[in-house]
Swiss-Prot record:
Function: Binds to 23S rRNA. Forms part of two intersubunit bridges in the 70S ribosome.
GO cellular component: cytosolic large ribosomal subunit
InterPro entries documented for this protein: Ribosomal_uL14, Ribosomal_uL14_bac-type, Ribosomal_uL14_CS, Ribosomal_uL14_sf
Gene Ontology terms: biological process: translation
Similarity remark: Belongs to the universal ribosomal protein uL14 family.
SUPFAM superfamilies associated with the record: Ribosomal protein L14
UniProt GO molecular function: large ribosomal subunit rRNA binding; structural constituent of ribosome
Protein name per Swiss-Prot or TrEMBL: Large ribosomal subunit protein uL14
Keywords, comma-separated and alphabetical: Ribonucleoprotein, Ribosomal protein, RNA-binding, rRNA-binding
Matches recorded under CDD domains: Ribosomal_uL14 (cd00337)
C-alpha cells in the first residue's frame, strides 16, 4: 500500500536508487496504490551516469509492496520492501533489466514487458 511521501526502492537499471511517491494516479481522491498501479515519483537518489538524475519527476509501476497481496485461492504474498520500476509516457520500462522477483498480478495489469524482463515471477 503506497501513498504520497512513501519512499520506494527502484527495481531496474535506469540509474535511480530511491524514489518518493508524489501522486497516485487513477482518480482525483485516490489515496493508495498497490502492486501494478502507476504512480508519479520524484528521484531522490541516483547513481552517476544513469539515465535519470536526482530531482527528475517520472512515472513508475509498483512491483513489490510490504503490504499483503491476497490471492483468489486464499494464499497471501508479501515482500520485505516497497519497490517500483520507472516507466516512460508510453508505459514502457526505462531500464533494460529488472532486479528481484515480481508478483504475477502484474500480468492482469497488462505489464507484460516487466514480467518478461523479471528474473522470477511469484
Amino acid at each position: 500500500m503506497i501513498q504520497m511521501q512513501t519512499n520506494l526502492d527502484v527495481a531496474d537499471n535506469s540509474g535511480a536508487r530511491r524514489v518518493m511517491c508524489i501522486k497516485v494516479l487513477g482518480g482525483s481522491k485516490r489515496k493508495y496504490a498497490g502492486v501494478g498501479d502507476i504512480i508519479v515519483v520524484s528521484v531522490k537518489e541516483a547513481i552517476p551516469r544513469g539515465r535519470v538524475k536526482k530531482g527528475d519527476v517520472m512515472k513508475a509501476v509498483v512491483v513489490r509492496t510490504a503490504k499483503d497481496i491476497k490471492r483468489a485461492d486464499g494464499s497471501v504474498i508479501r515482500f520485505d520492501s516497497n519497490a517500483a520500476v520507472l516507466i516512460n509516457n508510453q508505459a514502457e520500462p526505462i531500464g533494460t533489466r529488472i532486479f528481484g522477483p515480481v508478483p504475477r498480478e502484474l500480468r492482469a495489469r497488462n505489464q507484460m514487458k516487466i514480467i518478461s524482463l523479471a528474473p522470477e515471477v511469484l
